C-alpha cells in the first residue's frame, strides 16, 4: 500500500518520518496512523517531531500498514519469533508471524540465529508482514564470522546493519549503550549480563580492550538509518536478569548513555525508542519508567516484561504481564511479550498465542488506566453482551474468540446453549445476571424509600 507514498522520497538523503514531521509535513503514514489511533493528524506530526512517538516504516517495506509507538497512542505489543540453530525453519517462522498478527501483535521481531539462511528467513518475514519488523543485527554479524566473536570488526557490524536496512527492516536493536567502563559494574550481580547482543559486545570489548564499536561508529549507523527510515531500538545490554539486579548501577549507567545516544540520533532526525528491563520488583517499576523518561528526554520506552518475580518458570507470561500492565500504566509505549517458554526453550505456536494474549490484556489494561480515548468501549460492549446472555457477541468481542468459545463449549456444546441464560458455572437457577431489575420498579422503590421507613427482617 505504500509503494506510491515512498516513490517520491527515494533518493533523498533523509527519508525519516521525523525529518518530514520537523519540516511541518504530515506524511501519508502519519495520516494513516491518525485514523488508526483516532487522534488528530497534526498531533501525530507534533509527537513524531518531538521524538515522543515513532512510526517505524522502512521505505522498502511497502506492504506495511503504518502504526505508532508513543505515549500519546495506544500501548503496543511486540512478539518475538525466530529460528535457532537447534529448532525451526523458514516456513515455521512465517507461520509464527501470521499467528502473531492474528492474535494482535503490533510489531514482530525476527531474532533468528540459525535454522537456515538468515537473509531468506528475514526477507520472507518482511514480505509477509503487514506490521513493522525489528531485528538484532549483531546476531547475524556473529554468524558471519562463524561464531568467533573476537574476529568481528566494526565494518562487519555496519555491513549487516545496512543489509537489514536494505531488506526492509523497520527498526533495529542497536546495543550501543554498553561501554567498556560499565563492565566492572556487573560484578555484584547474580545473573551478570543476560542480553544476547550485550553479551556478544561485552566479550568483544573484554578481548580487545577497546570501546564498543557500535558506540564509536554510532554516527555511521545514523547515516544508514536516515537513508531507509530505520528506527533505532536502543538495546539495554545491561538490563537486569533477575529482581536482585534491578535498578543497579550497571543498568542506570547504560541508561544515561542511551539518553545521550537518543539525542544524538535526534540531531539527524532519526527516530528512536529505548529498550528497558527485564526483571523488576513491582515497587521499582514506576521509578524505572520515570527514570527512562528523564534520561532519554521522553523517547518511547519499550520494555521486556518486566517480570516481577523469578520463581515461576513455565508461567513467565503471567509474572511478566503483571509488570507489563504496571509499566504501561506508568507510560511505557510498547511491551515486548514473554511466553510460557521464557528461560526454558524456543516457543512454539501455542506459546506465541498465550504470550500475546497475556500482553494484549496488559496493554489494554494500561490504556484503560491512562484513560485513552475509546479504550473501554470494547469492555462496555462485551459487558452488555454478557448481561444480555448474547454468547456469540461475547465470543466476537473477546481478545481470543476461539479460546472463549472453546471453554464455553467444553461443558455446554449444543447450539441451544448459545441462547441460554446461564453457563455451567451457576446453572439455570443461580445465575445472578438473570435478575433483571425493571426501571419502572426501581422508580417506584425510590418513591417508597423516600417516604416510608424500611421494615427490618
From Swiss-Prot:
PANTHER family: PHOSPHOMETHYLPYRIMIDINE SYNTHASE, CHLOROPLASTIC (PTHR30557:SF1), THIAMINE BIOSYNTHESIS PROTEIN THIC (PTHR30557). Catalyzes the synthesis of the hydroxymethylpyrimidine phosphate (HMP-P) moiety of thiamine from aminoimidazole ribotide (AIR) in a radical S-adenosyl-L-methionine (SAM)-dependent reaction. [4Fe-4S] cluster binds at residues 423, 426, 431. This is Phosphomethylpyrimidine synthase. Binds 1 [4Fe-4S] cluster per subunit. The cluster is coordinated with 3 cysteines and an exchangeable S-adenosyl-L-methionine. NCBIfam families: PRK09284.1, PRK13352.1, thiC. Pathway: Cofactor biosynthesis; thiamine diphosphate biosynthesis. Substrate binds at residues 80, 109, 139, 175, 195-197, 236-239, 275, 302. Belongs to the ThiC family. GO terms for molecular function: 4 iron, 4 sulfur cluster binding; carbon-carbon lyase activity; zinc ion binding. It comes from Nostoc sp. (strain PCC 7120 / SAG 25.82 / UTEX 2576). HAMAP family: ThiC. It holds the Pfam family ThiC_Rad_SAM. GO terms for cellular component: cytosol.
Amino acid at each position: 500500500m505504500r509503494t506510491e507514498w515512498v516513490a517520491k522520497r527515494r533518493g533523498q538523503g533523509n527519508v525519516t518520518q521525523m525529518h518530514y514531521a520537523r519540516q511541518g509535513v504530515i506524511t501519508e503514514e502519519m495520516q494513516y496512523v491518525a485514523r488508526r489511533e483516532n487522534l488528530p493528524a497534526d498531533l501525530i506530526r507534533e509527537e513524531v517531531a518531538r521524538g515522543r512517538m515513532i512510526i517505524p516504516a522502512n521505505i522498502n517495506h511497502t506492504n506495511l500498514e503504518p502504526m505508532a509507538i508513543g505515549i500519546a497512542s495506544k500501548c503496543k505489543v511486540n512478539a518475538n519469533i525466530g529460528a535457532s540453530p537447534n529448532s525451526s525453519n523458514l516456513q515455521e517462522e512465517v507461520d509464527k508471524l501470521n499467528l502473531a498478527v492474528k492474535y494482535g501483535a503490533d510489531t514482530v521481531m525476527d531474532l533468528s540465529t540459525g535454522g537456515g539462511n538468515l537473509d531468506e528467513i528475514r526477507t520472507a518475514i518482511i514480505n509477509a508482514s503487514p506490521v513493522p519488523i525489528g531485528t538484532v543485527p549483531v546476531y547475524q554479524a556473529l554468524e558471519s564470522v562463524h561464531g568467533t566473536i573476537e574476529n568481528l570488526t566494526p565494518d562487519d557490524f555496519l555491513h549487516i546493519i545496512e543489509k537489514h536496512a536494505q531488506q526492509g527492516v523497520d527498526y533495529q536493536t542497536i546495543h550501543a549503550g554498553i561501554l567498556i567502563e560499565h563492565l566492572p559494574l556487573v560484578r555484584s550481580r547474580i545473573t551478570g549480563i543476560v542480553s544476547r547482543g550485550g553479551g556478544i559486545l561485552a566479550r568483544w570489548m573484554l578481548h580487545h580492550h577497546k570501546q564498543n564499536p557500535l558506540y564509536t561508529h554510532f554516527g555511521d549507523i545514523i547515516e544508514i538509518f536516515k537513508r531507509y527510515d530505520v528506527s533505532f531500538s536502543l538495546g539495554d545490554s545491561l538490563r537486569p536478569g533477575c529482581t536482585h539486579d534491578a535498578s543497579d548501577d550497571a543498568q542506570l549507567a547504560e541508561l544515561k548513555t542511551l539518553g545521550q545516544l537518543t539525542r544524538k540520533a535526534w540531531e539527524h532526525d532519526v527516530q528512536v525508542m529505548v529498550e528497558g528491563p527485564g526483571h523488576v520488583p513491582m515497587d521499582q517499576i514506576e521509578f524505572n519508567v520515570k527514570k527512562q523518561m528523564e534520561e532519554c528526554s521522553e523517547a518511547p520506552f519499550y520494555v521486556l516484561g518486566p517480570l516481577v518475580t523469578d520463581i515461576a518458570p513455565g508461567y513467565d507470561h503471567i509474572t511478566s504481564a503483571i509488570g507489563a500492565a504496571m509499566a504501561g500504566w506508568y507510560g511505557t509505549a510498547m511491551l515486548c511479550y514473554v511466553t510460557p517458554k521464557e528461560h526454558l526453550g524456543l516457543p512454539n505456536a501455542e506459546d506465541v498465542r498465550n504470550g500475546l494474549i497475556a500482553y494484549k490484556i496488559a496493554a489494554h489494561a494500561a490504556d484503560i488506566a491512562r484513560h485513552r480515548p475509546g479504550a473501554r468501549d470494547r469492555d462496555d460492549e462485551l459487558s452488555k453482551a454478557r448481561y444480555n446472555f448474547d454468547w456469540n457477541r461475547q465470543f466476537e468481542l473477546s481478545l481470543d474468540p476461539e479460546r472463549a468459545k472453546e471453554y464455553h463449549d467444553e461443558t455446554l456444546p449444543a447450539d441451544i446453549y448459545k441462547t441460554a441464560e446461564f453457563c455451567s458455572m451457576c446453572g439455570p437457577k443461580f445465575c445472578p445476571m438473570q435478575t433483571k431489575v425493571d426501571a419502572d420498579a426501581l422508580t417506584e422503590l425510590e418513591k417508597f424509600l423516600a417516604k416510608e421507613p424500611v421494615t427490618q427482617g
